[in-house]
Design a protein with these regions (language model features):
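Non-catalytic, well-ordered alpha-helical scaffold segments
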Residues: 100, 125, 235, 276, ...
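Peripheral, non-AAA+ core regions of ATP-driven protein-machinery
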Residues: 2-6, 13-21, 54-68, 86-87, ...
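Phosphate-sensing "switch" segment of ASCE/P-loop ATPases
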Residues: 256-260, 264, 271-356
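Conserved ASCE/P-loop NTPase catalytic core
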Residues: 3, 44, 58-65, 69, ...
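Phosphate/oxyanion-binding loops and surfaces in catalytic or ligand/nucleic-acid-binding neighborhoods
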Residues: 134, 138, 304-308, 395-398
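N-terminal chloroplast transit peptides
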Residues: 1-51
Length: 423
């Protein structure tokens, strides 16, 4: 299965025009007719000339003389890698369940993230951070702290949308998807962002300093030891991940911005569990155990020693595998929309959920999405029962009601019920 497999500190002033560096890459503009409001669709209170939402919200992109060349971008990426070398994802030995859950979330972010629970020292953080090399590139408005999508109004900050509607030309650049680490001791203001009340009162402007949720928009937010995080912060993260927006309210002043990200949490069950209500908000759940096979343990130790001795040489030895997996992910993301799942299989998935007494419909929805993402990863356009069998334990095990008298693993209960229904 292993083979198938910066936050800006400058305050944003809503009442002042935005200025973006024109030395980045491309320029986008949205032609508009002054005084004409007919045929507009409204996103967040701003009318957008369109007939059917995003499909009509395409912008004209033109190159400028100071465009950053691909070679310069590659050089910048290489310099970042040299500062902090990351262990290659394809070099990880074992932990196939966890790796598959991560890949499926990258292919379809709407799965809803993944919660990883396992013993200490099993490579949870290493594997999550190794995902950085496989993340695809996206187009963003240069200089925008929210990583606004130049073609999707639902992923734009308010100022960018206003500027586009005015006909302003904004620079566009291509960058890799962000992975943002949330420190365990982070405050709510650091996570959500802060409003400068003094400036609001004295100057009459909304001065907002974006937090980690703004930086994670259209990217990945990773929380290590999420089970030790304050419950109210976990609630904030899960609400933002589900709604795709973050709202900050202080002293009667309210500011909202897009916050669409993949939430990845990890933790050690010995240090405490998450509340069932919070667990249910994670799309998938992966259990990571200590490798017991002596030969595999030796291989892991040897590979780690090679990496520590010469990270660049070690990464180069896995370059071909990394590129192959990256292409596979890109192809799966492109073909995901054409993957189909038969109605009969949908009915059986829902029957499994119903007979396991799974509360709500999140389990049904996530299982359908994960099965389609797996089919896309394998290069198929149709979901098979085998795809469902692979993902359904990770989609449902954390949604089952806990029975203190039940000794069997919840994942095994899901598998038993699957074969009972699908046979």
């Amino acid at each position: 299965m292993a083979r198938i497999l910066g936050t800006c500190s400058t305050a944003i002033l809503a009442s002042r025009p935005l200025s973006f560096p024109t030395s980045k890459s491309s320029v986008l503009s949205l032609p508009s007719t002054p005084g004409q409001s007919h045929g507009r669709k409204f996103y967040g209170g701003i009318g957008i000339p369109a007939k059917k939402g995003r499909s009509q919200f395409h912008v004209a992109v033109t190159n400028v003389a100071t465009e950053i060349s691909p070679a310069e971008q590659a050089q910048k990426l290489a310099s970042k890698e040299s500062q902090r070398p990351v262990y290659p994802f394809s070099a990880v030995v074992g932990q196939d369940e966890m790796k598959l859950c991560l890949l499926l979330n990258v292919i379809d972010p709407k799965i809803g993230g993944v919660m990883i629970m396992g013993d200490r020292g099993t490579g949870k953080s290493t594997i999550v951070r190794s995902l950085v090399d496989l993340l695809p590139q996206i187009q963003v408005v240069a200089g925008d702290p929210f990583n606004s999508d130049p073609e999707d109004p639902e992923s734009m900050g308010m100022e960018v949308r206003e500027s586009i509607l005015k006909g302003d030309k904004l620079p566009v650049m291509t960058t890799k998807i962000n992975m943002v680490d949330l420190p365990l001791g982070a405050t709510e203001d650091r996570v959500c962002g802060t409003i400068d009340i003094e400036k609001a009162l004295t100057e009459g402007v909304k001065a907002f300093e974006p937090g980690l949720l703004a930086k994670a928009n259209r990217g990945i937010l990773y929380v290590d030891e999420v089970n030790l995080l304050d419950d109210h912060l976990v609630d904030v993260l899960l609400d933002s991940a589900a709604s795709g927006w973050n709202t900050v309210e202080r002293e009667g002043i309210s500011i909202s911005h897009p916050a669409r990200f993949i939430l990845i949490g990890s933790g050690n069950p010995e240090e405490g569990e998450l509340r069932p209500q919070l667990l249910d908000r994670f799309g998938m759940h992966a259990q990571v155990g200590t490798v017991r096979d002596a030969e595999l343990r030796v291989k892991i130790v040897e590979e780690r020693a090679r990496f520590d001795k010469n990270p660049k040489e070690f990464r180069d030895s896995y370059k071909a595998e990394q590129e192959k997996l990256q292409q596979q992910i890109g192809s799966a993301r492109s073909s995901l929309g054409s993957v189909e799942i038969d109605h009969d299989l949908r009915v059986k998935i829902s029957k499994v959920c119903a007979e396991l007494n799974v509360d709500g419909l999140r389990g049904d929805i996530v299982t359908n999405r994960a099965a389609k993402a797996l089919a896309a990863l394998k290069g198929r356009d149709k979901v098979t029962p085998e795809d469902i069998a692979t993902v359904i334990p990770n989609c449902l095990r954390h949604r089952l009601r806990k029975d203190p008298l039940e000794s069997i693993d919840s994942g095994l209960l899901v598998i038993e019920k699957f074969y009972e229904v699908f046979s």
